[in-house]
């Protein structure tokens, strides 16, 4: 029976907030977001600060791995060349930021890169946090930027909090020189990171036969604009939308469908939040890409759409719509997982 790598999370990478380090070089904030496939509300983040040389090293390592995979249908993303003059110009900094972000996002649909030791080592030193705990309730003011340490920990001065801690980088350099047979003791932060970048565990493949492309009726369930004229939605979907209009206030009805009636106005007659329109646009394009066979683009579109839904749903004033958005996000996550296993693994 075949075995496949186990990955319980969908990932979303961003590279942002370039700043000048006190030593003179530019560093970038790298955020890795892990969204649980079982519970879309279970989101974890790892944040590290990296410089151009770190990205260039990762690019070389991953390019070597990708070359040995003999994947001819996709081109490994290029990375900006190093330069001595002009590297502090805004255009150069933006080019490097964009190149680094494209590199990280390229790894998402390739398990050999997504779970590579080099990628895990790249995020070594980052702390695993749960952003949903900070923004889960918008009626409560967010916590201060500088959390109060426990009594048994020394207080960090405000002007020191933005400086990157040198210890993880130094320790990482020492680990590369150490003999693998005698690794340093793992810390709780390292164990949490290892669980997210778990490239060693395997699970039995499902005994059911692999599903082929979805039928038109099934695709209609994922089509944000399936109510448009000429779209030809299935009778089942028409019935669902009719029930939605007739009983939008009932808790047992699905309160939100991208592009549907419930999105137009909320309970108080105000326009629906902007995040729904943004997510609808992304998911619609993902559907079109999937129909056209552009599976990497479709996967990215579903992931980006779900990312916007999960970021916007805590601030939605409608409790019924919040529940509907969560259900739809789970459906799109499931579809993204199917695309990954059926077409990109």
UniProtKB/Swiss-Prot annotation:
The modification Phosphoserine is found at residues 208, 234. InterPro entries: Intracell_Sig-Traffick_Protein (IPR051866), MIT_dom (IPR007330), MIT_dom_sf (IPR036181), PX_dom (IPR001683), PX_dom_sf (IPR036871). Keywords: Methylation, Phosphoprotein, Protein transport, Transport. Residues 1-130 form the PX domain. Residues 141-151 have a biased composition (Pro residues). Residues 133-163, 226-274 are annotated as: Disordered. The modification Omega-N-methylarginine is found at residue 105. Residues 272-345 form the MIT domain. The keyword Manganese does not apply. GO terms for biological process: protein transport. SUPFAM superfamilies: MIT domain, PX domain. GO terms for molecular function: phosphatidylinositol binding. May be involved in several stages of intracellular trafficking. Overexpression of SNX15 disrupts the normal trafficking of proteins from the plasma membrane to recycling endosomes or the TGN. Belongs to the sorting nexin family. This is Sorting nexin-15. The gene is SNX15.
């Amino acid at each position: 029976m075949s075995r496949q790598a186990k990955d319980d999370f969908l990932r979303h990478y961003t590279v942002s907030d370039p700043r000048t380090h006190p030593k003179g070089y530019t560093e970038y904030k790298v955020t890795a977001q892990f969204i649980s496939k079982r519970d879309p509300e279970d989101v974890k983040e790892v944040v590290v600060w990296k410089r151009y040389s770190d990205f260039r090293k990762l690019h070389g390592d991953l390019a070597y791995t990708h070359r040995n995979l003999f994947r001819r249908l996709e081109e490994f993303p290029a990375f900006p060349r190093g330069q001595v003059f002009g590297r502090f110009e805004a255009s150069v900094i933006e080019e490097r930021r964009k190149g680094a972000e494209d590199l990280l996002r390229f790894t998402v649909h390739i398990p050999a890169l997504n779970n590579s030791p080099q990628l895990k080592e790249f995020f070594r030193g980052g702390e695993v946090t749960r952003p949903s705990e900070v923004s889960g309730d918008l009626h409560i003011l967010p916590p201060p930027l500088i959390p109060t340490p426990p009594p048994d920990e020394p207080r960090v001065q405000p002007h020191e909090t933005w400086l990157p801690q040198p210890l993880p980088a130094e320790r990482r350099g020492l680990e590369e020189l150490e003999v693998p047979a005698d690794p340093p003791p793992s810390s709780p932060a390292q164990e949490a990171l290892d669980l997210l970048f778990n490239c060693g565990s395997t699970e039995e493949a499902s005994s059911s036969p692999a599903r082929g492309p979805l039928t038109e009726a099934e695709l209609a369930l994922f089509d944000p604009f399936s109510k448009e004229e000429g779209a030809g939605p299935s009778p089942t979907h028409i019935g669902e939308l009719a029930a939605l209009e007739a009983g939008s206030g009932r808790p047992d009805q699905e309160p939100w469908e991208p592009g549907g009636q419930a999105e137009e106005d909320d309970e108080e007659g105000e326009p629906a939040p902007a995040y729904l329109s943004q997510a609808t646009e992304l998911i619609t394009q993902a559907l079109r890409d999937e129909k056209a066979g552009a599976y990497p683009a479709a996967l990215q579109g579903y992931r980006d759409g779900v990312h916007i839904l999960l970021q916007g749903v805590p601030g939605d004033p409608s409790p019924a719509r919040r529940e509907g958005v969560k259900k739809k996000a789970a459906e799109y996550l499931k579809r993204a997982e199917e695309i990954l296993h059926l077409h990109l693994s």
